Amino acid sequence: MTGLERQLTEMLEAPVEATGYELVGLEFIRAGAHSTLRIYIDHENGINVDACAEVSHQVSAVLDVEDPISVAYSLEVSSPGLERPLFKAAHYEQFIGHEVSIVLKMAVANRRKWKGIIHSVDGETIAVTCEGQQEEFALSNISKANLIPKF
């Protein structure tokens, strides 16, 4: 998570929760002249378009006042979807036993990309069984992690 993403998460968590939804996480994606702030929300009863619109309206008001982003960007609010991104230790705990794809910031055993089954979570470290071998990754070293859906 970048410094901006951390700042945005801290700024937006309370307003999102005030609408009755969980802020799963967010990504700020820079792509040349066009950037995107993607916010993932969830609720025990699921997410629909009205929920996304409600949270988008709330978040837009906060962003307009605080103005933390200095470049032009689009705001997207969505459910985490089938390939749910994992941001926090609690997310990994929730999905122990599920398959995950992980991209690391710094290589472990000369690899940055890993796929495996989430085995356990211990504080800020997760254990994943990859190709029959258990590997441990610090959450601070994970650039991106997504569940791999089973069909």
UniProtKB/Swiss-Prot annotation:
Keywords: Cytoplasm, Ribosome biogenesis. It is found in: Cytoplasm. GO terms for cellular component: cytosol. PANTHER family: RIBOSOME MATURATION FACTOR RIMP. This is Ribosome maturation factor RimP. Belongs to the RimP family. GO terms for biological process: ribosomal small subunit assembly; translation. Pfam families: DUF150_C, RimP_N. Transmembrane segments: none annotated. NCBIfam families: PRK00092.1-1 (NF000927). Required for maturation of 30S ribosomal subunits. It comes from Vibrio campbellii (strain ATCC BAA-1116). InterPro entries: Ribosome_maturation_RimP, RimP_C, RimP_C_sf, RimP_N, RimP_N_sf. Its main location: cytoplasm.
